[in-house]
Amino acid sequence: MMQRVAKLSVQTASRVSFKTCTNNFSAATATKSTSSGSVPSFFTESTSTPLNQSKTNTSTLNKSSKLNNNLIDNIMYVYFIY
């Protein structure tokens, strides 16, 4: 999967192709359960709170799983475009 993603990032593809690629990538992202709820492992570190923020901010992020998915899509989208 990672090789395929890397290959797509070098091509001069349209924005739609990049978006499709990020959707596939975020769907495979695992989630971890914390005291404030379930968050994508992308944000989770074993020695600190997610994103180095307080648990109050983390629980705000967890209120909508759709918000979490869109956030991952946007982060990955920026990674592939820039």
From Swiss-Prot:
Spell out the Polar residues composition-biased ranges. Answer: 39-50
Q: Where is the composition biased (Low complexity)?
A: 29-38, 51-64
Q: Which domain of life is it from?
A: Eukaryota
Q: Map out region (Disordered) in residue numbers.
A: 29-64
What's the name of the protein?
A: Putative uncharacterized protein DDB_G0288657
Provide the species name. Dictyostelium discoideum
